[in-house]
Amino acid sequence: MAAHHRQNTAGRRKVQVSYVIRDEVEKYNRNGVNALQLDPALNRLFTAGRDSIIRIWNVNQHKQDPYIASMEHHTDWVNDIVLCCNGKTLISASSDTTVKVWNAHKGFCMSTLRTHKDYVKALAYAKDKELVASAGLDRQIFLWDVNTLTALTASNNTVTTSSLSGNKDSIYSLAMNQMGTVIVSGSTEKVLRVWDPRTCQKLMKLKGHTDNVKALLLNRDGTQCLSGSSDGTIRLWSLGQQRCIATYRVHDEGVWALQVNEGFTHVYSGGRDRKIYCTDLRNPDIRLLICEEKAPVLKMELDRSADPPLALWVATTKSSVNKWPIKGILNFRSSGDYENDCSTPLSPICSQPDQVIKGGASIIQCNILNDKRHILTKDTNNNVAYWDVLKACKVEDLGKVDFEEEIKKRFKMVYVPNWFSVDLKTGMLTITLDESDCFAAWVSAKDAGFSSPDGSDPKLNLGGLLLQALLEFWPRTHINPMEEEENEVNHVANGEQENRIQKGNGYFQVPPHTPVIFGEAGGRTLFRLLCRDSGGETESMLLNETVPQWVIDITVDKNMPKFNKIPFYLQPHSSSGAKTLKKDRLSASDMLQVRKVMEHVYEKIINVDTESQTTSSSNNEKPGEQEKEEDIAVLAEEKIELLCQDQILDPNMDLRTVKHFIWKSGGDLTLHYRQKST
C-alpha cells in the first residue's frame, strides 16, 4: 500500500503550547537511555534519551570530556535509533509520533516523517538494501528507503512508503535481516509476525511467548530469529520450520534487550533483573553472568570493531551508560569457567565497567506552590530546586534539603487559579498551556514583583504575559495589525519604526534558548522551535500555519482576556443585631481585596447619613476627593470587620483566597459584616 507524507498544519484541532525549562546546553542524559548506536570508524556512540535528546559521544577512552553534541528536535522520549549509510545518516523514532532523519556527522535534522499516529517504539535496518522499518503503538509498520529520505528537501517533501498490515496489538520490537528479505515484529499480542518486505506479504505467525515481546534479532539470511519477552524467556525460532526450536530461561524477570555475535552462536541478554548474561545458543545450560547493572537494562550495543566483540555498551533506566569488557568470554565453553547448574547463583565476571558515559539527574517530584508561579522539584540525586514558571528559569538550587519542609516554608495564604500543567516525563520541567485555563490567573503587578513605568499597579494575566514572552521574537507580534499601515507611513522614512516597535510583554523575557512546542492535546507535536528562532523566515511561516487563534488573540491582536468575576452575598453578622438585608447577589473581580468590600459596607450601609457626600462622579474629580477616598479606607478598617465562616478576614486578602481557604463550600460565597466594638 502506498501512502504520502506531507507536513501537517494546525487546522481545527485543539492546539496546546508547551515549553521546557532547561539549560541552553544539556550535556548529560537527564533520564533513562532507550537506545544506542556505535560508529566504530569514528569512535562515536549515539545515545537516545528519555529526555527527548540524542547525544553524540567520543568513546576514545583518552578523552576527558566525551560529549560532542546534542541532536534536538524530538519533544518526547526517543525510543530507538539506527545508523545508516555507513554512519552518515541516523534515523530516530519517538513517542512524539514522528520518525526523524538526521545528518549524523553534522548533527542536524534533515526531515520529519509524520505517518505514525501514536508512539513510534521500534526501528529495524537492512544494511544491504538501505531500508528502514518503523513500528509502534498504532499497530502499523512502515518501510522507508533511506536514500529517498536523505534526498528530501523543502520543495521535494513528499515520500512514498509501503506498509505492512495485520498487527492486532501495539508493536514494541522489530527486526529485519541485513539482506532485507525478512521482517519480524513483536507485540503485546505475544506472538511474532513475519513478513517479506519486498512484497509486503505476511509469511507466518509464531506463538509461544506468554507476554509482550520486547526484543528481536534475525540472522543474516533471515532463517533464524531470537526473541526476548517480558515473560522472562529468550526463544530461538526456525522460520523455515515455523516453530520455536529452543527456549532459554536465564533471567528472573522480563528480557528487554538482546545482542548476538556475528556467527549467531552466543546471545547477550538483559532486562528487568539488571543482570546481563551471555548464553551459548547451542547449549542452553552454558551461560555466563557478565555483570549486574544498577537499574533495569533497556538496550545493549556490541562493539563490533573486532570479532569476537571486545565490549558491550549498556543503557538502563538510569542516565549513565556503561561499557563492559567482554574480550575472550566466548572462549568460556572450553575453559570450564561457566556454570551449567542453573540452580547455583552465578558471580559476575566484571565488577566495574571499563568506561562510563556519566549521566545527569532527572527531576522525579514537583510541587506547584500556591502562588501558581513557582515550583519546587526533587531529582534523582535528592537535590531540591526552586523554579520560576513565568520567567522559565531556575531560581535557586537548594541542595539536599527536606522537600516537604521547603513546601511548608514557602506556603502563603493566597489563592491563584491553576493556569498551567507540569510534565516530568523527560526528567526536565515541561510546562503546558491550554486554552481552557491559560488565562485563569490574574495578579497585581506589585504582587508579581513588577513595577509599572507610570507607578500604577495594573492587573496582569500570567498566561498572557508568558505567551507574549515565548513569542517575543516573532515579527507578527511586534506591531498591532490595526496600526501597521499608519506606522509604515509615519516612521519608515525617518528610520524610527524599528525603535517604535514593542516586543514581548514589557515586563520580562524568557531565556532565548527555551524550546517552544505547539502540539495537539492528544500528544502529537505540530511544531518545535527555540524561542529566539521565531524571527526566522521559515519559522515565521510555520508559526503562521500552527499558532492557534487563542494565542493569536493575545500575542498578535493584544486582546487581553476578561477578569474573572466571583458572585457573593453580603449580610450583617448575627452578633451585630442588625436586620438581615434583602439577599442581593453581588459580583466583583475575584482579585478584589477584602478592604474594598469593607469600604463598600462603611460607605453604603453603615454610614448612610453621609452617602450623598461620597457618591461624586468619577468623571469629575474634585480637589480633596483623593483624600476623601483615603479617609474612607482608614475609617472602614477602623470601624468595620468582615467575616467568613465566623473567621475575621485580613483586609489584604482577596475574594478568591477567601473562597478557597475559608469558605471551602459549594454555592456562592457569603460574607458577614459588623462594626468593631469600641
UniProtKB/Swiss-Prot annotation:
User: InterPro entries, per this entry?
Assistant: G-protein_beta_WD-40_rep, WD40/YVTN_repeat-like_dom_sf, WD40_repeat_CS, WD40_repeat_dom_sf, WD40_rpt, WDR48, WDR48/Bun107
Region Disordered: list its residue ranges.
608-629
UniProt keyword annotation of Chaperone present: no
Q: Where are the WD repeats?
A: 28-67, 73-112, 115-154, 166-205, 208-247, 250-289, 292-334, 358-397
Output compositional bias ranges, type Low complexity.
610-621
Q: Which domain of life is it from?
A: Eukaryota
Q: Name one GO cellular component term.
A: nucleus
Q: Which CDD domains match?
A: Ubl_WDR48, WD40
An example GO biological process term is: positive regulation of double-strand break repair via homologous recombination
Q: Which Pfam families match?
A: DUF3337, WD40
Instruction: Provide the alphabetized UniProt keywords.
Output: Cytoplasm, DNA damage, DNA repair, DNA-binding, Endosome, Lysosome, Nucleus, Repeat, Ubl conjugation pathway, WD repeat
Spell out the molecular function terms from Gene Ontology: deubiquitinase activator activity; DNA binding; double-stranded DNA binding; single-stranded DNA binding
Q: List the subcellular locations.
A: Nucleus; Cytoplasm; Lysosome; Late endosome
What does the record give as the function of this protein? Answer: Regulator of deubiquitinating complexes, which acts as a strong activator of usp1, usp12 and usp46. Enhances the usp1-mediated deubiquitination of fancd2; usp1 being almost inactive by itself. Activates deubiquitination by increasing the catalytic turnover without increasing the affinity of deubiquitinating enzymes for the substrate. Also activates deubiquitinating activity of complexes containing usp12. Together with rad51ap1, promotes DNA repair by stimulating rad51-mediated homologous recombination. Binds single-stranded DNA (ssDNA) and double-stranded DNA (dsDNA).
Domain topic, free-text comment: The WD repeats are required for the interaction with deubiquitinating enzymes USP1, USP12 and USP46.
Q: Which family does it belong to?
A: Belongs to the WD repeat WDR48 family.
Protein name from the UniProt record: WD repeat-containing protein 48
Q: Which organism is it from?
A: Xenopus tropicalis (Western clawed frog)
Which taxonomic lineage does the organism of this UniProt entry have?
Answer: Eukaryota, Metazoa, Chordata, Craniata, Vertebrata
